[in-house]
Amino acid sequence: MLRKIPFLFYILLVTASANAQYYFKDIISNKQLIADMTAYKENKVRTITLKSFEDNGSESEGFFCEKKLSRDYRKAELFTRADIAPASLFTSIFDKDGMLLITKDSSDLSVTDIVYTYDDKRRIASVISHIKSNDDDFVNIISQEHIYTYNENNQPEKMILVKNKKDSTIILFGYDDNRNVSIEKDTKNGTKFFYYYDSKKNLTDIVQANEYSKRLKPDYVFEYNSAGKITQMTAVEEGSNNYFIWKYTYDNGLRIKEKCLTNEKRLMGSIEYEYK
Protein backbone atom coordinates (compact mmCIF):
# COMPACT_ATOMS: atom_id res chain seq x y z
CA MET A 1 0.00 0.00 0.00
CA LEU A 2 1.34 3.43 -0.90
CA ARG A 3 2.07 5.70 2.03
CA LYS A 4 -0.12 8.80 2.09
CA ILE A 5 1.76 12.07 1.63
CA PRO A 6 1.17 14.38 4.63
CA PHE A 7 -1.19 17.09 3.42
CA LEU A 8 1.16 19.90 4.48
CA PHE A 9 3.97 18.72 2.18
CA TYR A 10 1.51 18.20 -0.68
CA ILE A 11 0.21 21.75 -0.35
CA LEU A 12 3.72 23.20 -0.20
CA LEU A 13 4.64 21.34 -3.38
CA VAL A 14 1.65 22.38 -5.49
CA THR A 15 1.58 26.02 -4.37
CA ALA A 16 5.35 26.64 -4.55
CA SER A 17 5.53 29.61 -6.87
CA ALA A 18 8.28 30.21 -9.40
CA ASN A 19 6.90 33.70 -9.94
CA ALA A 20 8.94 36.73 -9.00
CA GLN A 21 6.91 38.95 -6.63
CA TYR A 22 10.13 40.49 -5.38
CA TYR A 23 8.44 43.19 -3.31
CA PHE A 24 6.37 40.54 -1.54
CA LYS A 25 9.18 38.03 -1.01
CA ASP A 26 12.01 40.46 -0.19
CA ILE A 27 10.32 43.25 1.74
CA ILE A 28 6.89 42.18 3.01
CA SER A 29 8.00 38.66 4.01
CA ASN A 30 11.05 40.15 5.73
CA LYS A 31 8.80 42.40 7.83
CA GLN A 32 6.60 39.42 8.71
CA LEU A 33 9.53 37.36 10.01
CA ILE A 34 10.64 40.32 12.12
CA ALA A 35 7.09 40.80 13.46
CA ASP A 36 6.82 37.09 14.32
CA MET A 37 10.03 37.17 16.35
CA THR A 38 8.86 40.33 18.13
CA ALA A 39 5.59 38.59 19.09
CA TYR A 40 7.49 35.56 20.40
CA LYS A 41 9.69 37.80 22.52
CA GLU A 42 6.73 39.74 23.93
CA ASN A 43 5.01 36.46 24.88
CA LYS A 44 8.26 34.92 26.24
CA VAL A 45 7.98 31.96 23.85
CA ARG A 46 10.99 29.66 23.68
CA THR A 47 9.65 26.59 21.83
CA ILE A 48 6.91 26.15 19.22
CA THR A 49 5.67 22.70 18.23
CA LEU A 50 3.56 22.21 15.10
CA LYS A 51 1.20 19.25 14.76
CA SER A 52 -0.19 18.35 11.34
CA PHE A 53 -3.56 16.62 10.90
CA GLU A 54 -5.12 15.01 7.82
CA ASP A 55 -8.62 15.61 6.45
CA ASN A 56 -10.06 12.87 8.68
CA GLY A 57 -8.57 14.41 11.83
CA SER A 58 -5.79 11.85 12.24
CA GLU A 59 -2.29 13.11 12.97
CA SER A 60 0.00 13.15 9.91
CA GLU A 61 2.14 10.04 9.99
CA GLY A 62 5.85 10.55 10.59
CA PHE A 63 5.60 14.35 10.75
CA PHE A 64 7.61 16.40 13.25
CA CYS A 65 8.10 20.17 13.27
CA GLU A 66 9.53 22.30 16.06
CA LYS A 67 10.93 25.83 16.31
CA LYS A 68 13.40 26.76 19.05
CA LEU A 69 14.28 30.35 19.96
CA SER A 70 17.51 31.48 21.63
CA ARG A 71 17.42 33.23 25.00
CA ASP A 72 18.21 36.61 23.45
CA TYR A 73 15.70 36.09 20.59
CA ARG A 74 18.36 36.65 17.98
CA LYS A 75 18.21 33.12 16.56
CA ALA A 76 15.35 30.82 15.54
CA GLU A 77 15.73 27.23 14.34
CA LEU A 78 12.84 25.41 12.68
CA PHE A 79 13.41 21.67 12.32
CA THR A 80 11.05 19.66 10.10
CA ARG A 81 11.00 15.93 9.43
CA ALA A 82 8.60 13.61 7.59
CA ASP A 83 8.76 10.04 6.33
CA ILE A 84 8.39 11.10 2.70
CA ALA A 85 10.86 14.01 2.69
CA PRO A 86 14.41 14.67 3.93
CA ALA A 87 14.76 16.45 7.25
CA SER A 88 15.33 20.19 6.97
CA LEU A 89 16.52 22.98 9.24
CA PHE A 90 15.49 26.60 8.67
CA THR A 91 17.60 29.06 10.67
CA SER A 92 16.96 32.80 11.08
CA ILE A 93 19.50 35.22 12.58
CA PHE A 94 18.58 38.72 13.84
CA ASP A 95 20.65 41.66 15.08
CA LYS A 96 20.31 43.32 18.49
CA ASP A 97 17.57 45.61 17.14
CA GLY A 98 15.50 42.71 15.83
CA MET A 99 16.36 43.17 12.15
CA LEU A 100 16.62 39.98 10.10
CA LEU A 101 20.19 39.38 8.91
CA ILE A 102 20.43 35.80 7.62
CA THR A 103 18.21 32.85 6.80
CA LYS A 104 19.48 29.37 5.97
CA ASP A 105 17.31 26.52 4.74
CA SER A 106 19.24 23.26 4.62
CA SER A 107 18.54 19.61 3.89
CA ASP A 108 20.43 16.69 2.37
CA LEU A 109 19.27 17.81 -1.08
CA SER A 110 19.90 21.56 -1.02
CA VAL A 111 21.06 24.54 1.00
CA THR A 112 19.68 28.06 0.55
CA ASP A 113 21.46 30.99 2.21
CA ILE A 114 19.96 34.50 2.16
CA VAL A 115 21.73 37.58 3.55
CA TYR A 116 19.91 40.88 4.16
CA THR A 117 21.63 44.26 4.39
CA TYR A 118 20.04 47.60 5.34
CA ASP A 119 20.77 51.28 4.79
CA ASP A 120 20.97 53.92 7.52
CA LYS A 121 17.16 54.29 7.43
CA ARG A 122 16.66 50.57 8.16
CA ARG A 123 15.42 49.92 4.63
CA ILE A 124 16.49 46.80 2.79
CA ALA A 125 19.53 47.66 0.69
CA SER A 126 20.22 44.20 -0.70
CA VAL A 127 19.09 40.60 -0.57
CA ILE A 128 21.79 38.12 -1.57
CA SER A 129 20.91 34.45 -2.00
CA HIS A 130 22.91 31.32 -2.79
CA ILE A 131 21.23 28.02 -3.59
CA LYS A 132 23.31 24.85 -3.71
CA SER A 133 21.57 21.64 -4.76
CA ASN A 134 23.05 18.17 -4.88
CA ASP A 135 22.17 15.41 -7.31
CA ASP A 136 23.72 12.01 -7.87
CA ASP A 137 25.66 13.33 -10.85
CA PHE A 138 26.32 17.03 -10.24
CA VAL A 139 26.18 20.01 -7.90
CA ASN A 140 24.24 23.06 -9.03
CA ILE A 141 24.84 26.55 -7.58
CA ILE A 142 22.60 29.55 -8.26
CA SER A 143 23.23 33.02 -6.87
CA GLN A 144 21.12 36.17 -6.95
CA GLU A 145 21.62 39.73 -5.78
CA HIS A 146 18.67 42.09 -5.32
CA ILE A 147 19.94 45.66 -4.96
CA TYR A 148 17.29 48.22 -3.97
CA THR A 149 17.16 52.00 -4.39
CA TYR A 150 14.49 54.29 -2.92
CA ASN A 151 12.83 57.60 -3.75
CA GLU A 152 12.41 60.65 -1.50
CA ASN A 153 9.26 59.11 0.04
CA ASN A 154 11.20 56.05 1.25
CA GLN A 155 9.48 53.85 -1.33
CA PRO A 156 11.39 51.20 -3.29
CA GLU A 157 11.88 52.73 -6.72
CA LYS A 158 14.06 50.22 -8.50
CA MET A 159 15.71 46.88 -7.91
CA ILE A 160 18.66 45.55 -9.88
CA LEU A 161 18.51 41.77 -10.12
CA VAL A 162 21.86 40.10 -10.76
CA LYS A 163 21.90 36.37 -11.49
CA ASN A 164 25.10 34.38 -11.09
CA LYS A 165 27.12 37.63 -11.00
CA LYS A 166 26.63 38.35 -14.72
CA ASP A 167 23.02 38.51 -15.93
CA SER A 168 21.24 41.66 -14.71
CA THR A 169 17.62 42.83 -14.94
CA ILE A 170 15.98 46.03 -13.73
CA ILE A 171 12.75 45.69 -11.74
CA LEU A 172 10.68 48.89 -11.50
CA PHE A 173 8.02 49.78 -8.92
CA GLY A 174 4.98 52.07 -9.17
CA TYR A 175 2.64 53.42 -6.50
CA ASP A 176 -1.02 54.13 -5.83
CA ASP A 177 -2.51 57.35 -4.44
CA ASN A 178 -1.77 56.19 -0.87
CA ARG A 179 1.93 55.66 -1.63
CA ASN A 180 1.65 51.89 -1.51
CA VAL A 181 3.69 49.86 -3.98
CA SER A 182 1.06 48.90 -6.54
CA ILE A 183 3.03 47.72 -9.58
CA GLU A 184 6.18 45.65 -9.99
CA LYS A 185 7.52 45.31 -13.54
CA ASP A 186 10.29 43.16 -14.95
CA THR A 187 11.80 45.30 -17.72
CA LYS A 188 13.32 42.29 -19.47
CA ASN A 189 10.33 39.99 -19.97
CA GLY A 190 7.48 42.43 -19.33
CA THR A 191 5.97 40.50 -16.44
CA LYS A 192 3.92 42.69 -14.10
CA PHE A 193 2.54 42.14 -10.62
CA PHE A 194 -0.21 44.35 -9.23
CA TYR A 195 -0.54 44.84 -5.47
CA TYR A 196 -3.87 45.86 -3.92
CA TYR A 197 -4.60 47.10 -0.38
CA ASP A 198 -7.50 47.76 1.98
CA SER A 199 -8.24 51.07 3.73
CA LYS A 200 -5.74 50.18 6.48
CA LYS A 201 -2.97 49.61 3.92
CA ASN A 202 -3.00 45.85 4.48
CA LEU A 203 -1.99 43.93 1.35
CA THR A 204 -5.10 42.13 0.04
CA ASP A 205 -4.25 40.85 -3.46
CA ILE A 206 -1.24 40.02 -5.60
CA VAL A 207 -2.24 39.71 -9.25
CA GLN A 208 -0.03 38.73 -12.17
CA ALA A 209 -0.21 40.00 -15.75
CA ASN A 210 2.20 39.83 -18.68
CA GLU A 211 2.70 41.33 -22.13
CA TYR A 212 1.34 38.23 -23.90
CA SER A 213 -1.96 37.93 -22.03
CA LYS A 214 -4.51 40.54 -21.01
CA ARG A 215 -5.96 38.21 -18.39
CA LEU A 216 -5.05 39.06 -14.80
CA LYS A 217 -4.13 36.03 -12.72
CA PRO A 218 -4.32 36.24 -8.91
CA ASP A 219 -1.53 34.53 -7.00
CA TYR A 220 -2.56 35.44 -3.44
CA VAL A 221 -5.59 36.96 -1.71
CA PHE A 222 -5.44 37.98 1.98
CA GLU A 223 -8.06 38.82 4.61
CA TYR A 224 -7.37 40.37 8.04
CA ASN A 225 -8.86 40.78 11.50
CA SER A 226 -9.15 44.07 13.39
CA ALA A 227 -5.62 43.60 14.78
CA GLY A 228 -4.14 43.36 11.29
CA LYS A 229 -3.44 39.61 11.50
CA ILE A 230 -4.06 37.50 8.40
CA THR A 231 -7.18 35.38 8.97
CA GLN A 232 -7.37 33.88 5.48
CA MET A 233 -4.98 33.39 2.58
CA THR A 234 -5.99 32.08 -0.83
CA ALA A 235 -3.06 30.71 -2.87
CA VAL A 236 -3.34 29.59 -6.49
CA GLU A 237 -1.85 26.23 -7.44
CA GLU A 238 1.10 26.75 -9.77
CA GLY A 239 0.13 26.09 -13.40
CA SER A 240 -3.52 25.46 -12.59
CA ASN A 241 -6.84 27.18 -11.96
CA ASN A 242 -7.17 25.36 -8.64
CA TYR A 243 -6.51 27.18 -5.40
CA PHE A 244 -6.21 26.50 -1.68
CA ILE A 245 -7.70 28.49 1.17
CA TRP A 246 -5.83 28.79 4.46
CA LYS A 247 -7.81 29.94 7.50
CA TYR A 248 -5.93 31.13 10.60
CA THR A 249 -6.92 31.42 14.27
CA TYR A 250 -5.02 33.47 16.90
CA ASP A 251 -4.79 33.82 20.65
CA ASN A 252 -2.97 36.73 22.28
CA GLY A 253 -1.46 37.64 18.93
CA LEU A 254 -0.02 34.17 18.29
CA ARG A 255 -1.28 31.79 15.63
CA ILE A 256 -2.74 28.68 17.28
CA LYS A 257 -4.44 26.88 14.40
CA GLU A 258 -4.71 26.89 10.64
CA LYS A 259 -6.72 24.73 8.30
CA CYS A 260 -6.52 24.27 4.56
CA LEU A 261 -9.44 23.83 2.17
CA THR A 262 -9.67 23.28 -1.58
CA ASN A 263 -11.54 25.63 -3.91
CA GLU A 264 -14.45 23.20 -3.48
CA LYS A 265 -14.33 23.93 0.28
CA ARG A 266 -13.12 20.39 1.04
CA LEU A 267 -10.90 20.17 4.11
CA MET A 268 -7.36 19.08 3.24
CA GLY A 269 -5.95 19.16 6.75
CA SER A 270 -4.98 21.40 9.64
CA ILE A 271 -2.05 22.50 11.79
CA GLU A 272 -2.03 23.26 15.50
CA TYR A 273 0.64 25.29 17.34
CA GLU A 274 1.83 24.69 20.89
CA TYR A 275 3.86 27.42 22.63
CA LYS A 276 6.17 26.98 25.60
Question: What does each model-identified segment do?
Answer:
Residues Q21-K276:
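Buried hydrophobic residues that stabilize the cores of well-folded domains
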Residues M1-K25:
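Bacterial Sec-dependent N-terminal signal peptides
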